[in-house]
């Protein structure tokens, strides 16, 4: 099982990624990051069923759980 964190989970692509990872049999969504959706359920933010995973406000919070891959779909700050 590959453990995935999605940064930018409340954006258009981030929501698609959350739904795709949640539906995949060989992937596990272990973190989702979106300041605007912090504390809400990642599945519900993505427009799907609840996943029992709260969205983190920062990447550091999400990385407190071991992960294998971080997919970053955040807006550049430069």
What feature does the model see in each segment?
Residues 6-10, 14-19:
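N-terminal Rossmann NAD(P)H-binding glycine-rich loop of SDR-like oxidoreductase domains
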Residues 49-53:
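Surface-exposed acidic, glycine/proline-enriched linker/cap segments
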């Amino acid at each position: 099982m590959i453990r995935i964190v999605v940064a930018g989970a409340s954006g258009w692509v981030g929501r698609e990624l959350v739904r795709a990872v949640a539906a995949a049999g060989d992937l596990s969504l272990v973190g989702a990051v979106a300041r605007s959706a912090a504390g809400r359920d990642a599945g519900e933010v993505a427009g799907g069923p609840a996943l029992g995973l709260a969205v983190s406000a920062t990447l550091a919070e999400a990385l407190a759980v071991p992960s294998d891959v971080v997919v970053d779909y955040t807006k550049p700050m430069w």
